[in-house]
Amino acid sequence: MSRVGKSPVALQGAEVALSDERITVKGPLGTISQAANSLVKVVNDNGTLKFEPVDESREANAMSGTMRALVANMVNGVTKGFERKLTLVGVGYRAQAQGDKLNLSLGFSHPVVHQMPEGIKAETPTQTEIVIKGINKQQVGQVAAEVRGYRPPEPYKGKGVRYANEVVILKETKKK
């Protein structure tokens, strides 16, 4: 059995609804749903969820760990939420959150407007910082990657959009 799949998931005040096709987790921040896999049996045991493979196949063992990780992220999302921080490095690079849109000034001849998907919020504590928040870990990471993709950090000066904890290794310029 998968090492990850063996450890149970504590619900931490979230409610879980189990059916044959879906697992739905409801918490103070919202509700999130995930398709259930037929190779994994999910058991609700007094505030903890246990994931057991239906048979001893490699695929069922692997899927038990995958389902456990996905549901653990769902529980964390509806109780605490996820966030990803981005910083803008460069002269004139600015960000401004307006409702469900993120306006970026990244040195192009036009402003870049990124539409936030439903359930994801963007905040700009300063003009050069962006905080992307939501209950779905995958969606938060995807939106952060899309925003970074508009102007990834370049290797000579390090200008661009980068994750807050990202280290950009700078190249040396060509010498005569």
From Swiss-Prot:
UniProt keywords, alphabetically: Ribonucleoprotein, Ribosomal protein, RNA-binding, rRNA-binding
Any Pfam family: Ribosomal_L6
Q: Is-annotated flag, keyword Ribosomal protein?
A: yes
Q: Name any GO cellular component annotation.
A: cytosolic large ribosomal subunit
Q: Name one GO biological process term.
A: cytoplasmic translation
Assembly state and interactors?
A: Part of the 50S ribosomal subunit.
- Sequence similarity: Belongs to the universal ribosomal protein uL6 family.
Name the job this protein performs: This protein binds to the 23S rRNA, and is important in its secondary structure. It is located near the subunit interface in the base of the L7/L12 stalk, and near the tRNA binding site of the peptidyltransferase center.
According to UniProt, the name of this protein is: Large ribosomal subunit protein uL6
Gene name, Swiss-Prot/TrEMBL: rplF
